[in-house]
Amino acid sequence: MKFTSNTLLFALSVAPVAAFTNPSPWSASSATTTALNAERSSNNVFSTFCATAAMSALLWGSPGMLAEPANNHQLPFGLNEIVQQNVVASAKDKASATGSRVNKDAESLLRLGLPIESKEVRELQSSLEGIKQDVASKRKGPAADGAKKVKSILASKKADKMAAVCRDAKVCTATMKEINDLMDPLEKAIKASQDAFTGSLEERDALDKAYNAQVKAAKLLTTLEEQMVPKGYKTPVPSQYSDLPQLEQRATVEMLIKKGEAGAQFDINGVNFPEARMTMVIDGYTSPVTGGNFVDLVNKGFYDNMPIQRSDGFVVQTGDPDGEAVGYTGGKAGKAIGEGPKGERLIPCEISIVGDKMPIYETTIEDEGRGGEATILPFSAYGAMGWARDEYDPNSGSSQFFWLLFDSDLTPAGKNVLDGRYPCFGYVVEGADFLQDVKEGDVIVSAKVTEGLQYLKQPN
């Protein structure tokens, strides 16, 4: 069975790159170097062209690359299909990009995916998140201006408007005060970095402090925005899927992976780790059925002791159990979709589009004639989680999923062509760097739901 996208562009867009998830942008990590180089070279058309041409030559020049895999794993794209077409999706509302900059911050994307309508908090989010980008690129003046803008917003009537739409105004008021208080040490750290010699330890230390203050403030921003989700809010789901598990809000899953070879360790930018620990946020607002299915399987222990079945530099994939079945067979199949050829519990393809009140089901954006529209959660962050399915059947997904290894340098802003074809149901928010060395044969020791299990709704 194959699982494909339909464009050469996507194949050219997803080379392995470390996520920008380190506690400090100045640690000796190639992940940081990658992020900074991406920023500095974002307008280097020639380098992008060369990289694209090199990948094209690889695909066209290696017939073996086009062979179908000799296994049952559902794949997120087939190279034989990719080289036949060159279809580019031109996003109208770029959820995955602003201007020419691709938003590859998983936590930012999750905030943008919340069902809230406060223009004031989105303005606050834009200013606060901009500080992180400016600090990482040593744009010290703009970073300082961003901190002043955050304080200005929080000192204005906009703060009252934000508190007014919270479920608990007191919680939001206190949270906004904490964010505001963090701007003082952030500004002080930026000023210290401006006074230090470029490249000095003093500059690095000051930028570390500024970066860490922004990270703390951003986590508080998440708390603030989550308070703005209306009480009891649930994404509408058609009644025909009521016999499938559903996730009504968000859940957090922690996963522990070890090397398949005894004694082997994960090599992350020259540092060895005996195990890989990742934290993922699963989104039930945009993917109630897909997210519910995944959280249900995690809670059942389905992924415990399961090997990684694919790692090719584009994706890391798992979820295919032993035996003839290519998905989960332990539960009752839903009536609307039915079961797979080997008794697999199947779920419908589920896509949430910007501006819609509920997801579309059993189809894709292209099949709906809405090609180019933006999805709420895009495949634009390293470690974005996608639901695998058969190439030509949108409703053949069961238990296989993948983490996307995303490289924004080769993906034009707003043109990630997985969006709208496959559900993006969550992101890795901690430990995404480990994905660069998770290989086929490595083993998921355990996967556990650590938060949000109460939001998993089982069929009656």
Across the structure, where does each feature detected by a protein language model lie?
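N-terminal chloroplast transit peptides
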Residues: 1-39
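Acidic/proline-rich low-complexity IDRs
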Residues: 7-11, 35, 57-58, 65, ...
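Compositionally biased, intrinsically disordered/low-complexity regions enriched for serine, proline
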Residues: 13, 20-22, 60, 66, ...
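Intrinsic disorder/low-complexity segments enriched in polar/charged and small flexible residues
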Residues: 22, 26-28, 62, 389, ...
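Long, composition-driven mixed-charge/polar low-complexity segments
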Residues: 31-45, 75-82
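Single-pass hydrophobic alpha-helical transmembrane segments typical
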Residues: 41-73
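Cyclophilin-like peptidyl-prolyl cis-trans isomerases
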Residues: 68-460
